[in-house]
UniProtKB/Swiss-Prot annotation:
Binds 2 manganese ions per subunit. It holds the Pfam family Peptidase_M24. One of its GO terms (molecular function) is manganese ion binding. It catalyses: Release of any N-terminal amino acid, including proline, that is linked to proline, even from a dipeptide or tripeptide. Gene3D superfamilies: Creatinase/methionine aminopeptidase superfamily, Creatinase/prolidase N-terminal domain. The gene is pepP. GO terms for biological process: proteolysis. This is Probable Xaa-Pro aminopeptidase pepP. The keyword Manganese applies. Its EC number is 3.4.11.9. Its cofactor is Mn(2+). Mn(2+) 2 binds at residues 264, 275, 438. Belongs to the peptidase M24B family.
Length: 468
């Protein structure tokens, strides 16, 4: 049994997470006793339909329970260190359609909780806990995630803000179980990326490759996608979050395959996400221009990865990626001027407009990054993580170079900025579209662990497409 499989054979560490959240509350001024209260996502019906909407568990609830059941509740009593899960009781009317639900005994075996009760017991339990916490005790819950029939009236104090913040901040640093979940999602995602590479030669439409990806993920245990797959062929790859996924892989004007396909797609394993991007030649061989850009982006990532360890300032890593892009585009003649002047004028933002990466966990764009979307410096405006990276965090490293007319043409029309871009040389690169390479990185005290195993070098990608 592998290390990942061995870790995942155990229970999700819900109680450890509850204790971590309480410690955060204590560090931020909370004293005394109290109760944490959270609700699972409710069963919801499709509007004008008798079918249920696809279910996605609330991440705050899962973090303190490890439970994927809808319509559940939990309480954590701080002073007694007791975590209780409340699950829906058996509904005889639904058994003939859906089978028997999980029993309290079964739930107790599955989840890292001290007690499992039915949801009909939640208000009596809250009333009892209110009597236990004393005259200055708190109940912590999340505004907007409290059912109308839930009563906190017996608690001296109610806080609907602090718990959400505490969980968001605690989620940044992952424990071994969480890292194993992300690694598992990455392992399945890598198999799906390989399946797409192998299907490329015979496919005629983006949707065929999307189907190959999703089918492989489901077959290997990731029934949900971490996000809507991006399967962008040709110049559509210059659109950062292209989602149509239904264009032909043939350029109808030349009757030849488009140059490249950008595949940004990943599976989700029991709420934990991967987030992986690869860009590869649809013909099985990079064009000279595509290979030049691919090599620049790969170097952007390689130089960024070399900087990673506990305490590194993420803004510094982001700037390093821009410096590599500038140097590479200067060498190709696309940019003109000095490296420092191009950096100062933020010219590289025209080709690399997004941030270098984001935290990853139960959400693809995970919590705790403290982005500043109002930043007046356009190089940092879309940087989703600001500040130093702690050991235990998981972050994406996803540099890219894009030839997007919507973004670049305003630079070409600007009398001041246009002098830094050679439009004649640029003309050769529009068909490249966009190149992005994205891996998922676990930060350690001395360095990092790359959780992503999908083929990445240009030679590997070409060999895989060509059946080697």
């Amino acid at each position: 049994m592998t290390s990942t499989e061995g870790i995942l054979a155990g229970k999700y560490p819900a109680k450890a997470h509850a204790r971590r959240v309480v410690e955060y509350l204590r560090q931020n001024g909370f004293e005394g006793d109290g109760v944490l209260y959270l609700e699972a996502q409710k069963t919801k019906m499709i509007e004008d339909n008798d079918s249920e909407q696809p279910f996605r568990q609330r991440r705050f609830f899962f973090y303190l329970s490890g439970c994927l059941l809808p319509d559940a509740h939990l309480t954590y009593h701080i002073s007694s260190d007791k975590l209780a899960l409340f699950i829906p009781p058996l509904d005889p009317e639904s058994v003939i359609w859906s089978g028997l639900p999980l029993s309290p005994t079964q739930a107790k075996e599955l989840y890292d909780v001290d007690e499992v009760l039915y949801t009909t017991d939640i208000n009596p339990t809250l009333a009892h806990l209110a009597s236990e916490v004393g005259t200055s005790g708190f109940v912590f819950a999340i505004d907007g995630q409290i059912s109308d029939d839930i009563s906190f009236k017996n608690f001296p104090e109610t806080d609907l803000v602090a718990l959400k913040t505490a969980i968001e901040e605690c989620r940044v640093v992952k424990d071994a179980y969480e890292v194993a979940m992300i690694r598992k999602a990455n392992d399945v995602t890598a198999q799906a990326h390989v399946a797409v590479l192998k299907a490329t030669k015979s496919a005629t439409n983006e949707r065929e490759l999307e189907a190959a990806f999703i089918g492989t993920c489901i077959a290997h245990g990731c029934r949900e996608m971490a996000y809507h797959p991006i399967v962008a062929s040709g110049t559509s790859s210059a659109t950062l979050h292209y989602v149509n996924n239904d264009e032909p892989l043939i350029d109808l004007t030349t009757n030849k395959k488009k140059l490249n396909l950008l595949l940004d797609a990943a599976g989700e394993y029991k709420t934990y996400c991967a987030d992986v991007t690869r860009t590869f030649p649809l013909s099985g061989k990079f064009s000279p221009e595509s290979r030049q850009i691919y090599d620049i982006v790969l170097e952007m990532q390689t130089k960024s990865l070399a900087m990673l360890k506990e305490g590194v300032l993420w803004e510094d890593v982001h700037v390093t990626a821009h410096r590599v892009a500038i140097k590479g585009l200067l060498k190709l003649g696309i940019l003109r001027g000095s490296e420092e002047e191009l950096l100062e004028k933020r010219i590289s933002v025209a080709f690399f407009p997004h941030g270098l990466g984001h935290y990853l966990g139960m959400d693809t764009h995970d919590t705790g990054g403290h982005a500043n979307y109002a930043d007046k410096d356009k190089m940092f405006r879309y940087l989703r993580v600001r500040g130093k990276l702690p050991a235990g965090s998981v972050i994406t490293v996803e540099p890219g170079v894009y030839f997007c007319r919507f973004i670049i043409e305003p630079y070409l029309k600007d009398s001041e900025l246009s002098k830094y871009i050679d439009a004649d040389v640029l003309e050769k690169y529009w068909e490249v579209g966009g190149v992005r390479i994205e891996d998922n990185i676990h930060i350690t005290k001395e360095g990092y662990d790359n959780l992503t195993t999908a083929p990445k070098t240009a030679d590997q990608l070409e060999l895989m497409i060509n059946g080697s």
